[in-house]
């Protein structure tokens, strides 16, 4: 949905296989919502609780849930009337945290900034002409009411991830935390990425007994933190940038999947 990270095929398969026998799904780091949307369409009966600490993002999801048609209508008008996406991007960026605007106006601003930013990184990125052409499209806007219907039964919160951690035997938790890399990708100018405590995160997850799947960047340090968990790597690139040494570095990166339970569909 949002270009925060892509290539969720393996997590989707693993989560999907578990939800056949679960009735509660939790996602503490909602982000672009790809996994939660898939789970909602595949298992519409589930109790789904999603969360993110980044308030402009959760505000968007909450408004989309309540006013999907209105968001689509307003965005259609804005796109037709706007001749300069860069100016629209900068104006929208200034609205995100300004409570002088309505939640609907801030949600619309978030959508514009997300779709027009480099790699969809919103406040942690700059304007991208390529992204504004490819992603801020009528096709995407027209699909918003459809997404609104899918998420009607979601519980959407703006809180710390740990409130969703549980020991419930009928719950499954998918966690997609900020990656432990040099680039600060999340929050306002990367503040939420920079301040994330990875050691504390590993400790809190390890203390819980509900079934959990975590997607992370792969490193020996992370593997050591989760030494009791099943781990698997796969190639994964999550950027729109495709030139030079940066792309070469991206291609060498691996995604790490961590499970605190045994799974037949999980390859170590």
Report the location of each language-model feature.
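Short loop/helix-cap segments at secondary-structure boundaries that form the rim of catalytic
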Residues: 42, 165-168, 221-228
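Long, positively charged, glycine-interspersed low-complexity recognition regions
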Residues: 194-268
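SAM-dependent nucleic-acid methyltransferase catalytic core
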Residues: 65-187, 200-203, 219
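SAM cofactor-binding core of SAM-dependent methyltransferases
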Residues: 24-91
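Short helix-loop-beta connector
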Residues: 22-24, 168-169
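Single conserved hydrophobic/aromatic residue that forms the stacking wall/gate
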Residues: 1-21
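Short His-Asn-centered micro-motif
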Residues: 28-29, 51, 157-159, 175-177, ...
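Short, solvent-exposed loop/turn segments at secondary-structure junctions
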Residues: 32-35, 54-56, 116-119, 161-164, ...
């Amino acid at each position: 949905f949002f270009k925060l990270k892509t290539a969720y095929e393996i997590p989707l398969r693993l989560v999907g296989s578990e939800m056949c026998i679960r009735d509660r799904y939790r996602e503490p780091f909602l982000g672009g919502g790809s996994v939660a949307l898939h789970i909602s369409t595949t298992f519409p009966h589930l109790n789904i609780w999603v969360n993110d600490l980044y308030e402009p993002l959760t505000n968007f999801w909450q408004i989309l849930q309540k006013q999907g048609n209105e968001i689509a209508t307003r965005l259609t008008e804005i796109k037709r009337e706007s001749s300069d996406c860069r100016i629209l991007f900068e104006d929208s960026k200034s609205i995100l945290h300004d409570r002088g605007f309505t939640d609907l106006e801030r949600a619309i601003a978030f959508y514009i900034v997300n779709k027009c930013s480099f790699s969809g990184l919103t406040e942690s990125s700059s304007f991208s002409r390529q992204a504004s052409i490819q992603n801020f499209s009528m096709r995407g806007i027209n699909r918003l009411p459809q997404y609104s219907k899918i998420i009607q039964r979601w519980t959407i919160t703006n809180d710390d991830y740990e409130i969703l951690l549980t020991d419930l035997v009928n719950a499954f938790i998918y966690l997609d935390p900020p990656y432990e890399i040099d680039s600060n990708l999340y929050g306002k100018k990367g503040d939420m990425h920079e301040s994330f405590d990875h050691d504390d995160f590993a400790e809190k997850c390890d203390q819980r007994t509900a079934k959990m799947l975590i997607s992370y960047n792969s490193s020996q340090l992370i593997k050591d933190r989760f030494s009791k968990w099943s781990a698997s790597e796969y190639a994964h690139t999550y950027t729109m940038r495709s030139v030079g040494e940066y792309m070469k570095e991206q291609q060498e990166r691996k995604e790490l999947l961590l499970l605190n339970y045994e799974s037949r569909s999980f390859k170590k």
